[in-house]
């Protein structure tokens, strides 16, 4: 029988005997337990015995997320674009499309842990000593949450099932103590004997979302409690979309627009499949006067583009913040990139459809000077119209949205490409290699399916049937990729489709862009708070080589976590002389018959939920000027049976 099945049987027996008096759960351990004793000791699943109280001060303390007040002004349409002719972007409308949960502050515990209360210590000990628990077979631990009413302020009792040893553990709260009292001598005295091995992890808080963990092992009788020379260093940073700052907000807004366009395309095709007849929805624009738009389109297509595509000066290195700022106002050189800035401002689907008609009329009648260089479907249509090789397209259904999505994905990728290459954080090849499976043959006019795949899209290996035949946009028979979800009618092979949309492919591309953006956020925070210029290339490479997590929607709560290893000498000067924010120290001693383990946990904040923490008396930290810690001690004794 598996270990989980054995522990589940113990849980069932405890429920039968004690379920009426106490709340008993079988699942993941509480977050505070994992922090105090360590993830390895806590395990993935435990049986936890406690009392549940859903009354009290939870709501008053506002420790859980609360829904933000709904926005009352304006239209229901989403406006993330602003006008291309004036700076009037209103980003507050983001809340209209997401569940906006405002966190008063981030809590280290879960919501359900706020309702947990301890049971009397003597009651917990009586269950531990009961015959049925002593004779039960299992693997894993039963933990009893206590009320701290005893002299030692016991918080948790542990009964561990072990086939060869008797194993017990006790976790108690030690109050608040100044940092200068945390010494090797004091810890060894608490441990009771000279440790054979000591594992130490110091955590330094750089900002509320960034921490540096320094860890090492020592066999000394009095181990060093601070070691910045040969420790293992891990940098952890959490980026939450809702915390996106003004420097990168514009790029995140563009990414959100692309996500919403994709959602509306998928929704439209789903309704069509179900027999619902309606026009698609476009909800991302601020609105623009159509006469202004016509004039802007004509000017964009007939003006000569600038020749400046890069700001690089030989091997000069630029400050990453400065590069991001310049990327926001960089000169766009490709026609479809400029058209993205115009077309995304349309107020509705109807306006967007009219805008494309004006665009096609201009392409067919005007002398286009600014020939598109991008390899997307819209660029090909404009080129063929200008060369009189294509009849005037009449867009219908989701085609305007699909064309807009494709040029938007390509333009935003170029923004990120500019940032990464100009700041010398990585080469274009790295972005290519990680966002596309192979290099593309951009110059082949016969390889039309490749035209809709921009630099960052994963390339399929399917050959195009009849690749040797001469193909034009009027006579194109595309191969259907059975591995993807494409939306096309029964006449998909009857002629050229004005646009292309692949649900899975679009998800992959948006997910890659989100990964690139999150990497940028992580690097910016490293630059602002640590200024570790020498590690940016390695960090960038490590993060971008990871498979991106699939992102189908973006709201303020979406987050990304970076956890990377650094060399100690990079952070030594930054951390020298500073007290850790938290400390986790484990001492072990053992002989042939017995093993003693003592874990000390110190944290600048009380990591227990308020109603649980108030059961333990502590001094007022506000009255102490120097660094102080809430402290816990965990003793575990394992004896041979």
UniProtKB/Swiss-Prot annotation:
PANTHER family: PROTEIN ZWILCH HOMOLOG. One of its GO terms (biological process) is cell division. GO terms for cellular component: cytoplasm; kinetochore; kinetochore microtubule; RZZ complex; spindle midzone. This is Protein zwilch. Gene3D superfamilies: 1.10.287.1880, 1.20.58.730. It is found in: Cytoplasm; Chromosome, Centromere, Kinetochore; Cytoplasm, Cytoskeleton, Spindle. Essential component of the mitotic checkpoint, which prevents cells from prematurely exiting mitosis. Required for the assembly of the dynein-dynactin, Mad2 complexes and spindly/CG15415 onto kinetochores. Its function related to the spindle assembly machinery is proposed to depend on its association in the RZZ complex. Failure to assemble the complex due to the absence of any one of its components, results in the incorrect redistribution of the remaining components to diverse membrane compartments. Pfam families: Zwilch. Disruption phenotype: Lagging chromosomes at anaphase and precocious sister chromatid separation upon activation of the spindle checkpoint. In spermatocytes the number of Golgi structures are not affected but they show a mild defect in shape. Belongs to the ZWILCH family. InterPro entries: Zwilch. Keywords: Cell cycle, Cell division, Centromere, Chromosome, Cytoplasm, Cytoskeleton, Kinetochore, Mitosis, Phosphoprotein. The modification Phosphoserine is found at residue 312. Component of the RZZ complex composed of rod, Zw10 and Zwilch. Disulfide bonds: none annotated.
């Amino acid at each position: 029988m598996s270990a989980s099945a054995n522990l589940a049987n113990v849980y069932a027996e405890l429920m039968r005997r004690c379920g009426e008096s106490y709340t008993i759960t079988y699942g993941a351990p509480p977050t505070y337990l994992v922090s105090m004793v360590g993830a390895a000791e806590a395990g993935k699943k435990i049986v936890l015995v406690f009392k549940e109280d859903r009354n009290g001060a939870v709501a008053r303390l506002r420790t859980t997320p609360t829904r933000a007040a709904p926005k009352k002004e304006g239209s229901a349409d989403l406006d993330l674009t602003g006008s291309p002719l004036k700076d009037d972007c209103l980003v507050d409308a983001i809340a209209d499309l997401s569940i906006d949960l405002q966190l008063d502050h981030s809590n280290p515990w879960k919501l359900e842990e706020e309702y947990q209360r301890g049971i009397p210590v003597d009651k917990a000990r009586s269950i531990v000593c009961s015959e049925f628990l002593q004779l039960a077979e299992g693997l894993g631990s039963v933990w009893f949450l206590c009320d701290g009413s005893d002299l030692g302020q016991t918080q948790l009792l542990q009964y561990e099932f072990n086939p060869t040893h008797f194993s017990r553990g006790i976790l108690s709260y030690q109050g608040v103590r100044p940092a200068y009292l945390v010494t090797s001598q004091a810890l060894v005295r608490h441990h009771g004997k000279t440790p054979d091995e000591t594992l130490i992890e110091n955590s330094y808080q750089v900002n509320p979302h960034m921490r540096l963990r320094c860890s090492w092992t020592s066999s000394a009788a009095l181990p060093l409690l601070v070691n910045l020379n040969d420790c293992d260093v891990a940098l952890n940073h959490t980026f939450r979309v809702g915390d996106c700052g003004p420097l990168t907000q514009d790029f995140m807004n563009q990414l959100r627009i692309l996500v919403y366009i994709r959602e509306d395309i998928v929704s439209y095709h789903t309704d069509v499949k179900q027999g619902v007849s309606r026009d698609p929805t476009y909800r991302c624009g601020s609105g623009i006067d159509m006469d202004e738009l016509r004039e802007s389109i004509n000017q964009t297509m007939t003006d000569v583009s600038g020749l400046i595509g890069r700001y690089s000066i030989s091997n000069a290195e630029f400050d990453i913040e400065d590069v991001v700022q310049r990327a926001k106002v960089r000169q766009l050189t490709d026609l479809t990139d400029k058209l993205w800035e115009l077309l995304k401002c349309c107020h509705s689907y109807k306006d967007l459809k009219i805008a494309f008609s004006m665009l096609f009329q201009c392409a067919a009648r005007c002398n286009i000077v600014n020939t598109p260089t991008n390899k997307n479907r819209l660029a090909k249509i404009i080129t063929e119209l200008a060369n009189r090789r294509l009849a005037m397209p009449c867009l219908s259904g989701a085609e305007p949205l699909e064309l807009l999505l494709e040029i938007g994905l390509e333009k935003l990728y170029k923004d990120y490409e500019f940032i990464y290459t100009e700041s010398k954080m990585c080469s274009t090849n790295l972005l290519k290699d990680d966002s596309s499976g192979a290099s593309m043959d951009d110059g082949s006019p016969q390889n039309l399916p490749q035209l809709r795949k921009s630099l960052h899209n994963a390339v399929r290996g399917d050959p195009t049937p009849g690749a040797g035949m001469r193909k034009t946009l009027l006579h194109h028979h595309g191969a259907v990729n059975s591995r993807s979800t494409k939306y096309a009618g029964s006449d998909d092979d009857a002629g050229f489709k004005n646009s292309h949309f692949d649900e899975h492919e679009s998800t992959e591309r948006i997910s890659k862009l989100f990964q690139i953006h999150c990497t940028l956020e992580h690097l910016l925070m490293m630059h602002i708070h640590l200024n570790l210029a020498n590690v940016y290339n390695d960090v960038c490479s490590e993060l971008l080589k990871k498979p991106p997590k699939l992102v189908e929607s973006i709201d303020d709560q979406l987050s990304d976590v970076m956890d990377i290893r650094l060399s100690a000498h990079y952070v030594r000067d930054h951390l020298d002389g500073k007290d850790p924010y938290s400390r986790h120290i484990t001492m072990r001693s053992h002989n042939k018959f017995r093993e003693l383990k003592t874990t000390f946990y110190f944290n600048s904040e009380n990591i227990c939920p308020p109603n649980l923490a108030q059961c333990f008396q502590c001094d007022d930290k506000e009255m102490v000027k120097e660094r102080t810690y809430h402290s816990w001690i965990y003793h575990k004794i394992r004896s041979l049976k």
